[in-house]
């Protein structure tokens, strides 16, 4: 099993579309100004936006792993994207920067290296 796609709400479709293009995602599907699907630059995963009247706050966080959090954040800031936090080193051994899309969906740019899947506190192979 693989995670292929995540869909998040967009309260202003055109604004959200422009935002994710600025972030660097590639538009692969767009339908009736209410649904769009993007392909990430690396890997096979996709992210979709779907027009909604409201988007619940405190929902899932979208994590994009990048090679260099600081340079990626600087590049996005130069395009007018504001960050709410970071880049900062976290106690769980990741470097992170956080931002929100126009609908308020939280996004975390991070670099974790081996600690993403194999942190020092990872459970053994028999854990369920």
What is the role of each PLM region?
Residues 29-31, 50-53, 111-115:
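Acetyl-CoA-dependent GNAT
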Residues 43-48, 104-107:
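Short, charged/polar, Gly/Pro-enriched secondary-structure boundary elements
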Residues 1, 33, 92-94:
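Loop/turn position at the start of each blade in beta-propeller repeats
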Residues 7-46:
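Core segments of cupin and vicinal oxygen chelate
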Residues 1-17, 60-62, 112-128:
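N-terminal beta-strand motif that seeds the catalytic metal site of vicinal oxygen chelate
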Residues 2-11, 38-39, 52-128:
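Vicinal oxygen chelate
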């Amino acid at each position: 099993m693989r995670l292929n796609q995540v869909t998040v709400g967009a309260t202003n479709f055109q604004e959200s579309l422009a935002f994710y293009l600025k972030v660097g995602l590639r538009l692969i599907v767009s339908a009736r100004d209410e649904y769009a699907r993007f392909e990430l630059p690396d890997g096979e995963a996709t992210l979709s936006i779907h027009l909604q009247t409201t988007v619940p706050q405190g929902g899932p966080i979208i994590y994009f792993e990048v090679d260099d959090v600081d340079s990626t954040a600087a590049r996005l800031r130069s395009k007018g994207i504001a960050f709410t936090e970071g880049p900062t080193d976290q106690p769980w051994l990741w470097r992170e920067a956080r931002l929100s899309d126009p609908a308020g969906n939280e996004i975390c740019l991070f670099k974790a290296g081996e600690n993403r899947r194999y942190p020092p506190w990872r459970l053994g192979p028999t854990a369920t």
